[in-house]
Amino acid sequence: MIDYIKSPVLKFKLIRLLEKNQYTFDVDPKATKTDVKYWVENFFGVKVIGMNSHRPPRKMKRMGPTIGYPVRYKRMIVTLRAGDSIPLF
């Protein structure tokens, strides 16, 4: 079940959210907010107080002579209680 959380996202705009105690993860498209909250709280030992999710727009990719779309994913922004932090970041 931990496969719901694919990877943390470290981009310039999202790094600024770390100052607000918000962490961003790419998750499985089938994952719900409840699933991700459960795994973040149990795996990292923190308290989640808010979550936002969105699906970034798809962009065309050229793969040799063919044009296609990469696999879709969902992105979750997790807000933690003041004083909590995730050691990965």
UniProtKB/Swiss-Prot annotation:
One of its GO terms (molecular function) is structural constituent of ribosome. It comes from the Eukaryota. Its main location: plastid. The keyword 4Fe-4S does not apply. One of its GO terms (biological process) is translation. It holds the Pfam family Ribosomal_L23. The gene is rpl23. This is Large ribosomal subunit protein uL23c. InterPro entries: Nucleotide-bd_a/b_plait_sf, Ribosomal_uL23-like, Ribosomal_uL23/eL15/eS24_sf. It comes from Staurastrum punctulatum (Green alga).
